[in-house]
Swiss-Prot record:
It comes from the Archaea. This is Small ribosomal subunit protein eS17. The lineage of its organism: Archaea, Thermoproteota, Thermoprotei, Desulfurococcales, Desulfurococcaceae. The keyword Magnesium does not apply. InterPro entries: Ribosomal_eS17, Ribosomal_eS17_CS, Ribosomal_eS17_sf. One of its GO terms (molecular function) is structural constituent of ribosome. One of its GO terms (biological process) is translation. Pfam families: Ribosomal_S17e. Belongs to the eukaryotic ribosomal protein eS17 family.
C-alpha cells in the first residue's frame, strides 16, 4: 500500500513546485534545505514530509518524461 500524506503536505508541496519548479531536484537533502529557506515550517517532521513529497513528484515527473521520449522515438 502507498503512503498516506495529509492535505497540508500535498497542497504546500504542489504550490512550492508550481512557484519554484527549477529550485527542486530528485535529491531529498537538497529539497529539505530549499523548503527550509522558502517557508517557515513549525516542525522538522512536517518539513521532511513536504520535501519528501516534492522529491517523489520530481521523480514521477522525470519518469513520465522518459516514457514520453521513448514513445516519440518509436
Amino acid at each position: 500500500m502507498g503512503k498516506v500524506r495529509i492535505n497540508v503536505v500535498k497542497r504546500t508541496a504542489r504550490k512550492l513546485l508550481q512557484m519554484y519548479p527549477d529550485l527542486f531536484t530528485r535529491d531529498f537533502e537538497h529539497n529539505k534545505k530549499v523548503v527550509s529557506q522558502l517557508i517557515e515550517v513549525n516542525s522538522k517532521k512536517l518539513r521532511n514530509q513536504i520535501a519528501g513529497y516534492i522529491t517523489h513528484l520530481k521523480k514521477v515527473e522525470e519518469r513520465r518524461q522518459k516514457v514520453e521520449l521513448r514513445e516519440e522515438y518509436l
